Amino acid sequence: MYDSRGVALHSELIHRWNHAFSILSIVAFPKKRLLFAGSQDSKILVFDLPTYNLIHTIRLGESQEETHTRSSVLCLTGSEDENFLFSGGADSLVRIWSIGEKTIRDDFLPVTEIATVYSVTDIGDIFSLAYLDSLETIVFGCQNASLLYVENLIQKIEKKSSDGVENINKLPHRRYDKFFDSLGPTGYSSNSLSQTSLTSLQENCGAAIIEVPSENIIKYAHYGFIYSINKLCPRFNQLLEKSSRTSGAEHIISSAGDGISKLWEFSKDKGQNTVKISLINDKIDNEDSVISQTIEFPFLYCGLTDGIIKIWDLNTQQIISTLKTKHESDVISISVYMDHVFAIDESGITHFYQNQVNHWNPQQGKILSSEIFSKSNAGSVSLLTGGSDGSLTLWDITSLLSAVPLSSNSPINASSTLQTTNLWAAYQSASLNNEEMLNTLRELISFQTVSQSKDTTNTLSLRRCAIYLQQLFLKFGATNSQLFPLPDGGNPVVFAYFQGNGKVSQVKGAKKKRILWYGHYDVISSGNTFNWNTDPFTLTCENGYLKGRGVSDNKGPLVSAIHSVAYLFQQGELVNDVVFLVEGSEEIGSASLKQVCEKYHDIIGKDIDWILLSNSTWVDQEHPCLNYGLRGVINAQIKVWSDKPDGHSGLNGGVYDEPMVNLVKIVSKLQNEQNEIMIPNFYSPLKDLTEEEYQRFQKITELANIDENTTVQDLITNWTKPSLSMTTVKFSGPGNITVIPKSVTMGISIRLVPEQSVEQVKRDLKAYLEESFKQLKSQNHLEIKVLNEAEGWLGDPTNHAYQILKDEITTAWDVEPLLVREGGSISCLRMLERIFDAPAVQIPCGQSTDNGHLANENLRIKNWSNLTEILSKVFNRL
């Protein structure tokens, strides 16, 4: 079945296997093209993917003939090289098998049980497993809320493979139990469960019997059954603060019935051949039992009761989205691939992607397990599900992932390996050539970082972009890079620090400076893509221009700055310290940036000397510019509403005060017939334009290729005078011309100049409107709401930084830059100056035709590469 876009609504069934008992756990070995399914009747079924045949059955715990459920296989996992299979279950044992290579001729698969791991304490059922390959450590979570682990497992197996007789009677099945092993009515006791079979196992297989050391048992690791354990990519270590990093450490996340998801670190104990465990974080509280979980880094997906799925950012430990299935039942299993979420509950499979929710029932009774994987080199992705009716079904979900590029070069196993593209590459050299920079920009543009959108897809994309930038800084050699979480749970701020390593000038009194580069990774929505000539989120290089959403505002200039600094640093030529502050909420007003800067002030730097940014364009297509002034803004909504419902002009017209009439009357008092703004004290702080500034504006009208009708007075009005615009009107009701709406809302946008106080104008505006409304003596109600605001900014175009930039721009373009101001606003600029007590300098990059917030956003490559060259000089000269 397909939707109106031709995208499949659910997957196609590839194959179905049937078994007499429930399928409780599954794991795929894509490279060996094998599937393993753990069953309720103490078996592990092994299937060959190319032929779909059952080629082997592993029987656990009892004789080869007897069917029983005492060793039900509740969880399975494998090593990354697929040479080892691990199982845990109802018998409190972890079993380990060596998996050989299947012979092509007769489908023979060498499977050898090489070890059994047990605990001397009663741990109950084993619900979850993870194998940490680099540490050869198996970790498992249990019914009694304990977390257990055995390190150096392969070494211990090799050492103890012929020694197990003294330990075999300590296994849970061999211990005397006062209840189960008591004398019955006959007065005789029967043989202990599995006594014969375990002896047979010991004699025939030579499997090692390994006891979990008591010091490796974390009692009450949770306060509930530990249902899930997932391991993190070893390079997750890079995301920790430098002081907290442990070389060679591995990490897991455990989740349990207590609702807490805990981050644990496993690391080699220095000087000893042991592994120690540390609890790193226990702040992720789902406030409900976690039945299942999976990781698609950097996100943790927790399946809860009542069909709830919570998505957490592991970097900031913040919840970023919540999904809900239509059927309010436990999310028994969850699988994720490239933001496609497959949630399993008793009603079937629910697929979430881009605000689309599709559901289908595979008719498997109650589905108990799931996994996403791909056949090696097949280029297709499959979903495997196991049901209570004994069925194991394989679904082709490639059509569901039609918007996602699939790679056939590497197998996918979403439960055991992390889906990360080139995110975790090691140290990378930085270059100032366009090809290297294009690779970085191409990655950045591919992230759909629309901060105005609250849908899950954009939210995840914004977080992925932040992680990408953090890793990019680290790969380029940044001394420190981390994400600063926003207090409201919004998009994190990316921080990076490059410590100057070049020689400081020998001039007397010269010292190293600390420069802050501000940028943002969020973008405006692309709108209707039919208005674009190219895909807005795929970088296109055409006719000397970069095209895509964000190339000009602000990802293109950001890449120029990053590569400039990284190149100097890697060459050992970065004279000054440079810090980057890159936010993800600029397009929605930078609401929490101030709190972040104040909280992390000491990390960012107490002694910032200069603030640089490139967040605007030239005034034309030909003349480079330096910007030294921006207007401020107050965007507000004025709402008038009635207690009465929508009315009819024929029945109710003239009977009572109408909200629309009230609103028109009060907003009409905001300006007089000469378009002067009537808010009290509005013009009082304004200063006259200096002769020097007038001459600058005169020069712009003479040199710049702008509208020939534009006068100096037009520039003065747009750049240095305040204004008030009435921008939107919304009302209740159907919009018919005869309907009197019960509520009406008007949007206004007030542009301020640097001399004006935003707080004072807000107070005066509110008081003026309230007094005007009071004079109407209306029975209706008034509400004034400020949506966002920004202070005006005025730099000093004669200071040291502007002079250096003027020199370098002149060298790069063979023409002096125009000194300009703008009528627009950057909400955080004045705030950054005030918090860090440093002057800001605005360096426009693109041309006036960049279409920053419009369709077909573009940036001339020459402008982009020249900015990079300019910055590589400026960062050292300041």
Swiss-Prot record:
Ranges occupied by WD repeats: 18-57, 68-107, 235-274, 282-322, 362-405, 608-651
Coiled-coil intervals, chain numbering: none
SUPFAM superfamilies (UniProt xref): Bacterial exopeptidase dimerisation domain, WD40 repeat-like, Zn-dependent exopeptidases
Keyword flag Repeat: yes
InterPro entries recorded: Bact_exopeptidase_dim_dom, Cyt/Met_Dipeptidase, G-protein_beta_WD-40_rep, GSH_degradosome_Dug2, Peptidase_M20, Peptidase_M20_dimer, WD40/YVTN_repeat-like_dom_sf, WD40_repeat_dom_sf
Gene Ontology terms for molecular function: dipeptidase activity; identical protein binding; metal ion binding; metallopeptidase activity; omega peptidase activity; peptidase activity
Co-factor: note: Binds 2 Zn(2+) ions per subunit.
This protein's UniProt keywords: Cytoplasm, Dipeptidase, Hydrolase, Metal-binding, Metalloprotease, Nucleus, Protease, Repeat, WD repeat, Zinc
The UniProt record lists the keyword Lyase: no
Primary subcellular site in the record, as a coarse category: cytoplasm
Gene3D superfamilies: 3.30.70.360, YVTN repeat-like/Quinoprotein amine dehydrogenase (2.130.10.10), Zn peptidases (3.40.630.10)
PANTHER family reported for this sequence: BETA-ALA-HIS DIPEPTIDASE, DI- AND TRIPEPTIDASE DUG2-RELATED
Stated family: Belongs to the peptidase M20A family.
Primary role: Component of the GSH degradosomal complex involved in the degradation of glutathione (GSH) and other peptides containing a gamma-glu-X bond.
Protein name, as recorded: Probable di- and tripeptidase DUG2
Source organism: Saccharomyces cerevisiae (strain ATCC 204508 / S288c)
